[in-house]
C-alpha cells in the first residue's frame, strides 16, 4: 500500500524578478514498510523535495503538483491539516543535530515539548515516555541524561536524541536528511543499524536522503537519483548498482576515490618525524586549581614522513589526530622530539621558527570557515606571500593566476569572494593558498569530508598530482578510510590519544592487527558496526 505519493512536484523560489527552479517534475512513491533513498550531489534538490512533503519551505517557495499521504492531499492543505501530519505521522531527522537541538534546554525539556503537544501526556508519564525513548535509541543510563544539555553529548548521542524526538509520536514515515554525514564511520554504522532496527520493530517507512552510495546500498529498498532538480533514474537498489542506465548514475557509482599513491624513491629525504610525542592537558580542580590528572590527547606518538610520501592518520573524533598534526607544526605545545627538515623545532624560538613556517602549510576541513568572507580569492591566496616574501620583487597577480590554474580554477575568478563558489571550488582555493608558498609539508585535516563523492575524487586526484609534481610530504587526517587508501602510503590508527596500529596502507588494510582497526574497516567498507 502506498504511504507517500509524490506526483509531478515542482518547486520554484521567487526573489524580486528572479525565479529559481529547484525541483522540476519529480514523481516517486514510498510504500508501507519500505525505505526509499533520494541520492544526488549538493544542490540536486533532494532536501527541498523532502521538505516539500509537509511544506516546511520558506514563503518564497511556490509548490505545484501533488503530494498525498495515506491518500490525503498535502499541497495546498490548511495549516491545521499540516500540523496534524507533521511530527505525528511524518517526522524528520536532520544532518546536524547541534543546530536542530536548542542549546539552552535540557534533553528532557526538548523531548517533553513534543510529547506534551502531540500526545497530551503530563507529569511522570512524560518522563517515563522519555526514558523509554532514550533506551530504545541506545543511550546508556538514560535517566541520568535527562538533565544534560546538547553540548554535553557526543555527536552520536545528539543524533540518537534527534531520532528519539522523531520517534516520540510513533510516525509512519521517517524522513532522514543526511543523518550520518557528520559522524565517524563507526558511529555512522551504529546509527544505520539503529534506524533499521527501529524501522523493522515499528513497521515504519523511511525516506533517506544522502550523497553516500555506501549507505544507500546498505539501507535502501529503492533508489531515486536526482540531478539539477529532476529524478534521472529510479529502481530497486540492486538493479541501480548492478546496471545503472543514466550516465549521471554511472558517474556517481564510479566516483569513489580510487587508485593508489605513487611509489616514493628510496632516497627520499625525511621531512618530518616525531619521537615519543606527548600532548597532555592538565585537569585542574579545587580552590587552588591543583593538577588532579591529565587528559592524554596524544600519548607517545612516533612517526616519520618523507618527501613525496603521504602519512594517513585515522581515528574517530577525539582520538588525537588533529592535535598531533598541530603539534608537528608547533601550533600547540608538546613534549618529546619533533624534527622538521632536520631541525629540532622544540629548540627554536619564534624568530627562528618563522623561516620554516612557509615550508609547512595546512588545509582545513571546512573551507567556508577557513576563508575570510571579506577577502577576494586573490587576497586570500597572496596572504602568505605578503607575510613570507614581503619586499621581494615578484608579480603576485601572475603567481596567483598560475596557482589557480594549477588547482583547476579559472584565474579570471580571482576578484570574486568565497560565497560565490561551490564547496569543491572553495577547497581548491584553500589548496592554492597553501601551495603558492611551495611548502615541503602539508597537513590535510579532513579536506574532503564535507564534499560530495564526485568532488572528493577530483580533490584526491588534484592532491596526488601536486604531490608527484613537487615532492610534497602530506599528513592526511581523515575518518574516511576509502580516501585514505587512495591517497596514502603509510597510515596510523589512533584511539583516545594512543597509536594503536601503524604500517603501510597495504599491511593495515589487508592484515589489521587490532580489534579496533578491524572495527573501523568493517564500518567503512561493509557499513556494519561491531559490538
Region locations from a protein language model:
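Conserved ABC ATPase "signature" region
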Residues: 125-144, 344, 394-412, 522
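A short, proline-enriched helix->beta-strand linker immediately N-terminal to the Walker B motif
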Residues: 168-172, 436-440
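ABC ATPase NBD coupling module
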Residues: 74-91, 109, 117, 123, ...
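A short, surface-exposed alpha-helical micro-motif characterized by mixed small hydrophobic
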Residues: 216-218, 484-486
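ABC ATPase "signature
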Residues: 231-235, 243, 499-503, 511
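Conserved ABC ATPase signature
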Residues: 148-153, 157, 417-421, 425
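Conserved ABC transporter NBD signature motif
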Residues: 62-73, 336-344
